[in-house]
Amino acid sequence: MSMAKQRLKLVIPGSHGLNIAAVLETPELEPKAYVLYAHCFTCGKDNMAASRVSRGLVAQGFAVMRFDFGGLGASEGEFADTNFSSNVQNLKDCSDYLREHYQAPSILIGHSFGGAAVLATAGDIKEVAGVV
């Protein structure tokens, strides 16, 4: 098992003009794959479930990006102005960022509400091989 090599705090430009706060954790060695994690309704990228899942996957050699949906955590915007479509777009924006700067996610993980957003997004990310 490898420990996290890096924990990068990222600011991803959202397609709606609002920045998305994200964290990318990578293992010591070349990642087996990149994972994009979507949190539950009104939670955030740093909640206990997201952090534990991320640490576990990094220990197994995966790189994991988790982010705050718009209006939550450190992401810009007002929660009251968000909806399911804007959350799906946040996922696509994060996927595009990974593709451009690292490697597109091949695994999407969603917790509760994040799971619904992941299912709605999976077909639009051609590299996705698995959804949890």
Regions found by a protein language model. Name each.
Residues C94-V132:
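Primarily recognizes the serine-hydrolase "nucleophile elbow" in alpha/beta-hydrolase
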Residues T42-S54:
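The serine-hydrolase catalytic nucleophile loop
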Residues Y37, A63-M65, I109, V132:
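Conserved Rossmann-like nucleotide-binding pocket used by diverse enzymes
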Residues K32-C40:
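Short beta-strand element of the alpha/beta-hydrolase
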Residues S54-E76:
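Conserved alpha/beta-hydrolase
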